[in-house]
Amino acid sequence: MTKTRTLVLIPARMAATRLPGKPLLDIGGLPMVVHVLRRAETAGIGRVAVATDTPEIAAAVTAHGGEAIMTRADHPSGSDRVFEALDRLDPDGRIETIINLQGDFPTIRPDIIRDVLKPLADPAVDIATLAAEIHSDEEATNPNVVKAVGSPVAPRRLRALYFTRATAPHGDGPRYHHIGLYAYRRKALQRFVELPPSPLERQERLEQLRALEGGMRIDIMIVDDVPRGVDTAADLETARRILASVPIPKLAYPRSNL
């Protein structure tokens, strides 16, 4: 995937109830969403932008040298927001691959962002995502931890069969913690947003099931650990401690290069 053909989009909203204003919370002098943006830039994949329906988020991103695109407020999922942003940023269709990166991963390693592209080297794959092996019963039984169930197709790679909040699969063997980072082929993203919400998507509250129920192929790259998301005040303090000792990446791929 070349830089000019790959776009990283970070959907960000002010809708969090446990941490109000989450994208703009300060971590070491920068808003959280700017940390995510800069780590995506450091991955060296290509152009990076924040997709938001909130003027305050857009203003904060641009004030720190990043790129933001305003989107509608009524999208049913982050993927729908990403598709609108793609269409507005690249109306001529030059971008071939889109990465959807959650805006609450301020400590994510750039190499993990690059890893999500690897399954798309197989032309049969529509969407790629990540997972890490689960090592505790607490994690395996936690409904807030989404489990990825799949069949091995290559070393450290699965073909997704299902995603669930339940403990799965049953019995002995590895279980995997799904990581909410996606890479889409452009046509696959368009097909996904054109599909209606599916029954299992509604039941599990997992939008990726819409793709599986629609007959799309999702492959999962296995990585060593789960990036630390920020959902609670305790998570925020942990991120602040981690980033206090880590240099802040500089923006590396200016918006004019697309």
From Swiss-Prot:
Localization per record: Cytoplasm
GO biological process, one term: lipopolysaccharide biosynthetic process
Keyword Nucleotidyltransferase: yes
This protein's pathway: Nucleotide-sugar biosynthesis; CMP-3-deoxy-D-manno-octulosonate biosynthesis; CMP-3-deoxy-D-manno-octulosonate from 3-deoxy-D-manno-octulosonate and CTP: step 1/1; Bacterial outer membrane biogenesis; lipopolysaccharide biosynthesis
GO cellular component terms, semicolon-separated: cytosol
Main location: cytoplasm
Sorted UniProt keywords: Cytoplasm, Lipopolysaccharide biosynthesis, Nucleotidyltransferase, Transferase
Catalytic activity field: 3-deoxy-alpha-D-manno-oct-2-ulosonate + CTP = CMP-3-deoxy-beta-D-manno-octulosonate + diphosphate
CDD domains, sorted: CMP-KDO-Synthetase (cd02517)
One Gene Ontology molecular-function label: 3-deoxy-manno-octulosonate cytidylyltransferase activity
HAMAP family, per the entry: KdsB
PANTHER family, alphabetized: 3-DEOXY-MANNO-OCTULOSONATE CYTIDYLYLTRANSFERASE, 3-DEOXY-MANNO-OCTULOSONATE CYTIDYLYLTRANSFERASE, MITOCHONDRIAL
Protein family according to the UniProt entry: Belongs to the KdsB family.
Protein known as: 3-deoxy-manno-octulosonate cytidylyltransferase
Taxonomic lineage: Bacteria, Pseudomonadati, Pseudomonadota, Alphaproteobacteria, Hyphomicrobiales
Gene (UniProt): kdsB
